[in-house]
Structure formats: structure tokens, C-alpha cells
Amino acid sequence: MNYREAGVDIEAGRAFVGDIRSLVESTRRPGVLGGLGGFGGFFELPSGYRQPVLVSGTDGVGTKLKIAHQVGRHDSIGIDLVAMCVNDILTAGAEPLYFLDYLATGRLDREQLTAVVQGIAAGCRESGCALLGGETAEMPGFYEAGEYDVAGFAVGIAEKSELLDGSQVQLGDVAIALASSGVHSNGYSLVRKVVANSGLDWTSSQTIFEGQSLGDVFLTPTRLYVKPILAAKAQKIPIHGMAHITGGGLPENLPRCLGPNQTVAIDLESWKWPTVFRWLAKQGNIADSEMFNTFNMGVGLVVIVPAAAETQALKFFKAQGQTAWTLGEVVTGDGTLIGLP
């Protein structure tokens, strides 16, 4: 008996590294030292920082993977993975530098996992960060054949004096929403339950989605906010705080970027729920409060700016191609958002 007969194909693993080498190289940026294949990745910190602080984050894409497996589409999952990590560290005011991935599978399917890495590389290029390395684990008996899981790790850099930790947020500041691209990568256990109970499948198309299949709608990749936020910082738009709206929706995530005894009064009339959320609520008979506590509801990122910079910030983000609007105002409170169902 040998290792391959036990379910682990080392030769296929080597070939896979060759398959993705050019994808990894396509993400190369200043600071990367060496290439793929070492025991660790090397990155030289950029000059020009007085007190550089490294900011790190890790995440996955949850059960959105189940839909990718059922539909057989894997090219967008990597974008989700990068976005979930870099959007998180972005909220601290950090510029993403590099990214690492972990792929675990029951049996190495080179074509399938190359598609995943294509998405990771695309997300890294869009975010200006290098895919510095990763790990691919073949784990027979742990995952079913054809199934895989992914995790990502992002590292960024910020000037210590410019870190966003809630202390800069002031009463009277305004909360500006940047639109999400859809459900992003949270709430998919509920999404899958709604679709299963509806008797539909992922190939079903709905008139409300203009002929798109449910698979296409719910595999829409998570939006990356790195470019517009770094551009805003370069233009000296004063950002006091940011929140990435992920699991737990606005109620869970927006208070994380505020200071003590602060909350946000939300203007529910300031935006209309995107179609995908209206469909989920109706199809699943989901209460409004549950929708807001589970999904982003069309708000992917919230940027807190002083009231005097509201018009400037809105104009700038719209010029960057973002759908942006004033979501609410920072007021006195205990962190419980005001105005939500």
C-alpha cells in the first residue's frame, strides 16, 4: 500500500502548484521577496511609515460553498474569500499587503481548485495585495470527494496614529453607506433553507431576477471596497470609522466602529431593499427584524465621516463608481441602533 492508495496524491499536489504559479505571480506587488514554494512567504515592509502597525484578519465564506458545489461553479468563491478578509482589515484604516489561503479537500481536483485560486488571484489584484502563499490539504475521509473548504488570511499596514478604533467618532458624525453587491458571504444557511423549502433549485430562474438563475444570483461575489477607501484616504477625506457589514448585519457590525455611549440613528427611508432581500423575505416569510439581524440588506460598508465632509464624501464615492447614500447620524446611545425593525 502507498500514500496514493490511501487517498493522497502528492504528484497531483505538485502539478497543482504548477497550475497556479502564474496566477500567484499575477498578484505580485512591491515588497514581495522570493517566489512560490518555500516554507514561508517573505514581504518587506514599505518605507515611509513613522510607526507602522500590521493589521491582520482571517475568514472563510461559510455555507455559500454548498451552492458552489451544487452548481459546479467555483471561480467567484476566491473573490469572496479575499473580500471577507481585506474588507475587515480595511475598516481599521489598513492597506492590504498580502494574502494567504488554505484549501482543504477530500480529493484534489486540479481544475476545480484552480478555478478557486483564479478567484483568489482576481480578488488580490483588485485589492492591490500579493498572494504570498498558501496550503492545499488533501484529506480523504474528512471531506467528501468533490467538496472543499477555504480559509483566508490577510495582512495590511497602517500608521499607528491613523488607526481607526472608534475613538475618532464624534456625536453628529454621519454614517455613509456603500452598497453591497448582494448577499455577500453571510446568512447562507438561511438562504439555502429558503430555497430548499420553496421547492426550487439553483438552476431555477425567477422573473424578479430578470432571468438569472438562483445559483447566479446567490453566487454573486462579495464587493471589494479597498480601492475607493484607499482613494478617499489619499484625497484626505476625513474618515472617523468604518464597519464591514457581515454576519449579524447592521445591528451587530455598525456598533463595532463606534465609541462608548454612541449609536447610529438609521434612516430606513434612505434606501430600498435590493431585490434579492425582498425575494428572500417574501419567499421565506422572514420578519424584517430577522432580515436585518442576518443579512447586510444592501449595505456592504459603512463609512463614518464628520457632518462637514458629508457632501464631499458622497460625491467622491459616487465618482468612484459606488452607490452611496447617507444612512444615518451618530447620536448618544448604548450601541443599539435606532430606527431598525
Swiss-Prot record:
* Protein location: Cytoplasm
| Keywords (A to Z) from UniProt | ATP-binding, Cytoplasm, Ligase, Nucleotide-binding, Purine biosynthesis
Q: Which cysteines are joined by disulfide bonds?
A: none
**Entry's Gene Ontology BP terms:** 'de novo' IMP biosynthetic process; adenine biosynthetic process
Give the source's domain of life in one word.
Bacteria
Chief localization class?
cytoplasm
| Pathway as given in its UniProt record | Purine metabolism; IMP biosynthesis via de novo pathway; 5-amino-1-(5-phospho-D-ribosyl)imidazole from N(2)-formyl-N(1)-(5-phospho-D-ribosyl)glycinamide: step 2/2
GO MF annotation list: ATP binding; phosphoribosylamine-glycine ligase activity; phosphoribosylformylglycinamidine cyclo-ligase activity
The family classification in the record reads: Belongs to the AIR synthase family.
Q: Which NCBIfam families match?
A: purM
Q: Indicate what this protein is called per its UniProt record.
A: Phosphoribosylformylglycinamidine cyclo-ligase
What is the primary gene name for this protein?
purM
